Amino acid sequence: LADWLAKYGCSDVCMESSGKYWIPVFNILEKTCWVTLAHPKYTKPQKGNKTDRKDAKWICDLYMCGMVKPSFIPPSDIRQLRDLMRYRTKLTNMLTSEKNRVQNCLTVSNLKLDDVFSDVFGKSSRSIIQYILEHPGEQFNVTPFLDRRCKRSIEEVQAAVDGAISREQAAKLKECLLHIDQ
């Protein structure tokens, strides 16, 4: 496309932004042309039979008359940084969702680890959860799992793990913990 435009001496390009379809075209053309990205709200064609050809002609006419307000497109490095930040935010949200699912499994199973540990995903709590998953329905002493810095008494922690986890909840819990650890 860039070669074809260069062949005909085209140095200005105006296009309508629609979804993410404009991005690859913009990335190619920004190196060789002055690209104006127009918001569809401001380039609405007149009423009648609409075709892509008529829309393109309309946008061209608006651009040539100076009636297209260009959208702000940051430089390439900023766009890439924004993309990475969006991805990081999505990963963080996914991690939070998985942690909420773990908490839900524990609550449904009457395992009140959040009452006795400030961090359900800390070392002591995770080791207790792991033991419960490996030995379902088995009564056990929590003492070997507790860190000496644990602020709650052994009796309080023991009472907090006095629940029963179903096979379904255990399977869900294992899967959630696997996702968190990845």
Regions found by a protein language model. Give the residues of each.
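A detector of single, family-specific signature residues
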Residues: 1-182
